[in-house]
Amino acid sequence: MGVFNYESETTSVIPAARLFKAFILEGDNLIPKVAPQAISSVENIEGNGGPGTIKKINFPEGFPFKYVKDRVDEVDHTNFKYNYSVIEGGPVGDTLEKISNEIKIVATPDGGCVLKISNKYHTKGNHEVKAEQVKASKEMGETLLRAVESYLLAHSDAYN
């Protein structure tokens, strides 16, 4: 088994606390509404949203995958940090054991924030992670973030 780590950063004009609340804490409800072309629904399989919670993320018709199951590993409300692992479905299967993800939202002096993202792909055997797989995952995350950001800009009273 190998572990391939990919890190990225992206910025947002939304304050860190508000984005954490909307994108992370309430994302299961908000994202299917603001980005139905990317995620059709999120089901809570077990748990209360904290560590150990299992969620099933369903994708719309025509998407390359029907679903993924995520396990919440950490929710740090003070430091705006969220860790979760993709444990089933989507790209996880013959070549990948799981994908561990860490999102940390850091406030910036201009009132916005930076999202620091780390993705660890845990492969099976000697398999390597393909660049297009990492690119597709990054693009999906960016699509979801921008949809939430647009919603928050249009609804200044939401998720404060």
UniProtKB/Swiss-Prot annotation:
GO terms for cellular component: cytoplasm; nucleus. Keywords: Allergen, Cytoplasm, Pathogenesis-related protein, Plant defense. It is found in: Cytoplasm. GO terms for molecular function: abscisic acid binding; protein phosphatase inhibitor activity; signaling receptor activity. GO terms for biological process: abscisic acid-activated signaling pathway; defense response. Gene3D superfamilies: 3.30.530.20. SUPFAM superfamilies: Bet v1-like. Pfam families: Bet_v_1. Brassinolide binds at K55, Y82, Y84, N101. May be a general steroid carrier protein. Belongs to the BetVI family. PANTHER family: OS08G0374000 PROTEIN-RELATED, STRESS-INDUCED PROTEIN SAM22. This is Major pollen allergen Bet v 1-G. It comes from Betula pendula (European white birch).
